[in-house]
Design a protein with these regions (language model features):
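Nucleotide-activated chemistry modules centered on ATP-dependent adenylation/adenylyltransferase
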Residues: 2-406
Length: 406
């Protein structure tokens, strides 16, 4: 009889390490450990993952690199939309989960797996993101979640691994981190107390730069084309370059409070230097290059795009429609943005764009008009005031009351 073939979405953390060993030893399954990398793992970490997977009893280990797919199919649209959840959080690691899950589902189908296992608990968002993706993309394949379904404690998992000869250090730290291409989330410690913020030592990237520094980010049709004059065909590398320049200033640190998919409130700290800088630069450039109504409608659909990403609705067909609108909106978002960086903050300096709508033959704001006469201006103002004049003529009592209040 053939052994049951199970793919474990393997991060190298405690829950997925326990899952690999338990399924191999206790269940006798044929375990395939698959690490879906969306840009958060270093080469050294991936090597450690492979070594540990085999020590835990996996038959095979594979790294599925979906960093480019993550950028091409979602991250670029998040930049187009200047997506910040609740106006604060760049949907860092959570936006990567869907692409990790899709990669795992494809791999499971490719090897003919009977089941997919992941290490999510029953208290967070990731269980929804993984399970929903597997149900849609790998129908008929069983989903196994030992940590959730067996209500396992961290100590139980550590003890089990130690008893079976796996001695990695899973000591509970004060903080837990999820590191990704689009930022790092921080949980635990002071975050559990709504009255407190995070101390300096909680951040992985410490402040090592003083003074100020100018950075130039060049966009072409909404995508990063160059950083400080250096051209980038690889957009992921451009993001990493900006991160290396801005993170030592402590830029992009904040606290996000929001609603989880399962309905409870959640609080998370984060550090996201490159995302916050890129979004600010991109949004600044759009103010010069988009029409008023392009900006307005793009803001509306961008909020929906970010919410759907967070809520595990990336596969919803309307997302492709929103992406089409976002991409269309970027056809004139080309130019160079200059910003000044300093410890804990940054500011926009200026824009140089061939599509600059501020510098036109019609005039400059607050200066001399060139595209109309003074009589044109007076006529425009009179016509614009018509709805208000009509209303208060019909409702004189409200007009009189308004005069008294003002």
């Amino acid at each position: 009889m053939e052994k049951k073939k199970v793919v474990v979405a393997f991060s190298g953390g405690l829950d997925t390490s326990f899952t690999v060993m338990y399924l191999a030893k206790e269940k006798g399954y044929e375990v395939y450990a698959a690490c879906a990398n969306t840009g958060g793992f270093s080469t050294e970490q991936l090597k450690d993952n492979e070594k540990h997977a085999y020590e835990l009893g996996a038959k095979e280990y594979v790294t599925l690199d979906v960093t480019k797919e993550y950028y091409d199919k979602s991250l670029r649209y998040m930049i187009f939309g200047n997506v910040l959840r609740n106006g604060t959080y760049p949907i860092s690691v959570s936006s990567e989960r869907i692409f990790q899950a899709m990669a795992i589902a494809r791999y499971a189908k490719a090897i003919g797996a009977d089941a997919i296992a992941h290490g999510s608990t029953g208290a967070g968002n990731d269980q929804v993101r993984f399970d929903m993706t597997f149900l849609v993309m790998a129908p008929g394949i069983e989903i196994i979640t030992l940590t959730r379904d067996m209500a396992l404690t961290r100590q139980f998992e550590v003890d089990y691994l130690n008893e079976h000869g796996f001695k990695a250090d899973f000591k509970k730290l004060k903080y837990s981190y999820n590191v990704g291409l689009w930022g790092t989330s921080i949980c635990g410690g002071e975050i559990l107390d709504s009255t407190q913020g995070l101390p300096e030592e909680a951040y992985l990237k410490q402040i090592t730069k003083n003074g100020s520094e100018v950075i130039e980010i060049e966009f072409e049709k909404g995508e990063i084309a160059a950083v400080n004059g250096k051209k980038f065909a690889d957009k992921v590398a451009a993001i990493q370059e900006i991160e290396s320049i801005a993170a030592p200033y402590g830029i992009g640190r904040d606290m996000h409070v929001g609603d989880t998919i399962i309905g409870i409130k959640g609080r998370v700290g984060f550090e996201a230097a490159a995302p916050m800088l890129i979004i600010a630069a991109h949004k600044f450039l759009e103010k010069f290059t988009l029409s008023k109504w392009q900006q307005y409608w793009k803001d509306q659909v961008s909020n929906w795009y970010g919410m759907f990403l967070h809520e595990s609705q990336y596969l919803e067909p309307v997302m492709r429609d929103i992406e089409a609108m976002l991409e269309s909106s970027q056809r004139n978002v080309t130019g160079k943005v200059t910003m000044e960086l300093r410890p804990w903050s940054f500011s926009t300096v200026g824009v140089d764009s061939p599509c600059d709508l501020v510098k036109t033959k019609f005039g400059e704001y607050g200066e001399m008009q060139k595209g109309w006469t003074s009589e044109d201006a007076k006529g425009f103002i009179k016509v614009t005031s018509t709805p208000l004049r009509v209303y208060y003529t019909a409702h004189k009592d409200e007009g009189e009351q308004l005069e008294k209040e003002l």
